Amino acid sequence: MIKLTGINKIYRTNEIETVALENVNLEVNKGEFLSIMGPSGCGKSTLLNIMGLLDAPTSGTIEIAGTKVDGMKDKELAAFRNRKLGFVFQSFHLINSLNVLDNVELPLLYRKVSAKERRRLAEEVLQKVGLSHRMRHMPTQLSGGQCQRVAIARAIVGNPEIILADEP
């Protein structure tokens, strides 16, 4: 499902070069769960962002769900990400101007799923995470744990092949 080969990530400024990842090789097969642990600043989020195609490595190759993504244009990567990957971000990244239901529907909107089907799927997944009674609430009206469940609902609503979670 995910195969990283020789992944390196170097952040450069005028004065300093920081090696975040060095020669990372990783393979995660269908049905496997992987937990990446380590101290703050060791590259966990950088690795997750590269695995999730949100950031590009300095060098190395990435294969997701049998597709080599090296060389894909930004628009292709965005469409691929939306079809194959679900994300639960450490800071949730909920849109405060949208209610819970609309936040969960968002990935389906990008996939051009009909409004009726988006609503049905979002309501179904909110029921599963125990938040159907909060559908019309805004993210600022929720607890941290509830926001986390909204983020999980948004990640799984499109039934992605792969779910990536940063400190879920």
Language-model features: locations:
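ABC family nucleotide-binding domain
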Residues: M1-P168
